[in-house]
Amino acid sequence: KLYQDYPALYEYDDTPDGFEWINHIEAEKNMLTFLRKAEKKADTLVVVCNFSDLAYEAYAMGVPYAGEYREIFNSDDESFGGTGVKNSGVQKAKKEEKDERPYSIEIQVAPLSVQIFSVKECGEKMVKESKVRRELEKKIKEEHKKEENRR
């Protein structure tokens, strides 16, 4: 059901356009955070993977859009035999840069878990900023490829 209800989990499965790192270098916390993207920016999902047995009560992470983020999946839910650490309600994005993103949210992160958040009220300005960011990332990758070919 989760997979069917959220286009970001399937729309761009066969292309890199459906994935974007938020932070892949939190080695000291054993955590990875990334985006799953779809054709509509409002369908973007934020995925938090905690490979540590530690919970974090106030984990700040960068997000691409203004708006409200709601936890839609938590592998640590008590119904799955987890500890029940969860984010109830919504987490409103603050205009505080984090992880090279213009906004951030503060969440509770469950131990040994995967948590997925959907975004609501994604502003048009943020959609444009995200598009510009993707274009810049694409140019950087092309430059790196050219540099490698010269060697």
Where are these regions (language model features)?
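Carbohydrate-interacting/catalytic domains
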Residues: 1-151
